[in-house]
Amino acid sequence: MSSAQNIKKSILAPVLDNNPIALQVLGVCSALAVTTKLETAFVMTLAVTFVTALSNFFVSVIRNHIPNSVRIIVQMAIIASLVIVVDQILKAYLYDISKQLSVFVGLIITNCIVMGRAEAFAMKSAPVPSLIDGIGNGLGYGFVLITVGFFRELFGSGKLFGMEVLPLVNNGGWYQPNGLMLLAPSAFFLIGFMIWAIRTFKPEQVEAKE
């Protein structure tokens, strides 16, 4: 397989074939919390992709110099440093979104996707493939976040990126926002529908009956 095909596979596979949320069921908490608006879902996607990609890269660079007994601590230190950088950038340039994301930016440190890729892939692979793997898994995570955020904001507020899309009753229109879509259970249902849809088109992802 050529280098270009490897890169393409590493980036696209986590979107549908091996999605970290839909297939591995990782990172669900933030998917519930930050998807009431498309804007916050998009920013969280960028933040997680940035942290996952660079943490993979740096862990891979020093992987042969990390004692096995402290490898998790070293990985968490690298991830925490990158999360602090992201948090400070958001507070400096996107303060309102930073307040909306609240503690969930800091909780990227404990995100199973970030830790999982550092341990399972970056510790065993070269820096560039690790970087690409991090980008792919960040995009796979973001695919679910942005899809869920799209439907929650559209039907919960009648808006997208804060701009009115469906004419609201309060403004003389016809659409009455569905408040249920702004509650966490709606994200569970939407993620469930996404898992059902993906596994309908990719039946190989369905677990074998015991």
Curated annotation (Swiss-Prot):
Topology of the protein relative to the lipid bilayer: Multi-pass membrane protein
Q: What EC class does the entry list?
A: translocase
The record's annotation in PANTHER family points to: ELECTRON TRANSPORT COMPLEX PROTEIN RNFE, NA(+)-TRANSLOCATING NADH-QUINONE REDUCTASE SUBUNIT D
Complex formation? Composed of six subunits; NqrA, NqrB, NqrC, NqrD, NqrE and NqrF.
| Record-annotated membrane-spanning stretches | 42-62, 72-92, 103-123, 131-151, 178-198
Q: Which UniProt keywords apply?
A: Cell inner membrane, Cell membrane, Ion transport, Membrane, NAD, Sodium, Sodium transport, Translocase, Transmembrane, Transmembrane helix, Transport, Ubiquinone
Molecular function terms, GO-annotated = oxidoreductase activity, acting on NAD(P)H, quinone or similar compound as acceptor
Q: Which GO terms describe its biological process?
A: sodium ion transport
Question: What is the catalytic activity of this protein?
Answer: a ubiquinone + n Na(+)(in) + NADH + H(+) = a ubiquinol + n Na(+)(out) + NAD(+)
**Which cell locations does it reside in?**
Cell inner membrane
Q: Which parts form a coiled-coil structure per UniProt? A: none
Q: Would the keyword Transcription regulation be found if you checked this record's keyword annotation?
A: no
Function comment: NQR complex catalyzes the reduction of ubiquinone-1 to ubiquinol by two successive reactions, coupled with the transport of Na(+) ions from the cytoplasm to the periplasm. NqrA to NqrE are probably involved in the second step, the conversion of ubisemiquinone to ubiquinol.
Highest taxon above the source species? Bacteria
Q: Which organism is it from?
A: Vibrio vulnificus (strain YJ016)
Which InterPro entries does the entry mention?
NqrD, NqrDE/RnfAE
What family is reported?
Answer: Belongs to the NqrDE/RnfAE family.
In Swiss-Prot or TrEMBL terms, this protein is called: Na(+)-translocating NADH-quinone reductase subunit D
E.C. numbers: 7.2.1.1
Q: Name one GO cellular component term.
A: plasma membrane
